[in-house]
Amino acid sequence: SLDYWAGRLQDRGLTVGQIARIDTRASLDFEDPEGQRFRLTEDAADAVTAPWEKSPVPAQHQIHGLGPITISVPELAPTEAVLIHVMAMRKVRDYASPDGHGTVHVYEMGQGGPAAELHVAVQPDLPVARQGAGGVHHVAFRVPDKPAIHAWAARLSEMRVPNSGEVERYYF
């Protein structure tokens, strides 16, 4: 399906990279017109999903989900402390950055797998990101129910981590 998507995205004028193996998975990097970077990743263990019948994309090429998320930080220690001690994630592996500069550290939550991973690239020479076009200003994590949302909001507040509290997912 990555070949299909490379052609589809190029036909629509997006900047598309080459299909490459990143962290053991076939992946395709591309950018939207504002410079926002995205990656399509094949997942052989993906759960069976029902295709959308009205999609212009053939069923065998439809996207099944989101993940993993990749963030860039100037140094690992502060982010790792929050991920492990506040967010209860597990560090599961590292891999060489696809651009050849540094290491990407992989943290996992819940059952794991691409949709439950956060990849942290240590890139000290990058400028600090600004909010606006071409950037992501927040990430949302799924929880099973409302009591879990309230528990996480309380945990973050107790640890003095700024947070939005409960946000209805359909808002987006």
Regions found by a protein language model. Give the residues of each.
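N-terminal beta-strand motif that seeds the catalytic metal site of vicinal oxygen chelate
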Residues: S1, A45-E80, V86, R90, ...
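Conserved short beta-strand elements that form part of the metal-binding/catalytic scaffold
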Residues: S1, F30, Q36-A45, V92-G135, ...
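Active-site-adjacent scaffolding segments
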Residues: S1-I69, Q111-P114
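Vicinal oxygen chelate
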Residues: S1-P33, S72-V82, A140-F172
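Extended intrinsically disordered, low-complexity coil regions enriched in Ser, Thr, Gly, Ala
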Residues: Q10-D11, A50, A81, A88-H101, ...
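Short secondary-structure boundary micro-motifs
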Residues: R12-T15, E53-S55, R90, P124-D125, ...
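Histidine (H) residue identity feature
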Residues: H61-H64, H85, H101, H105, ...
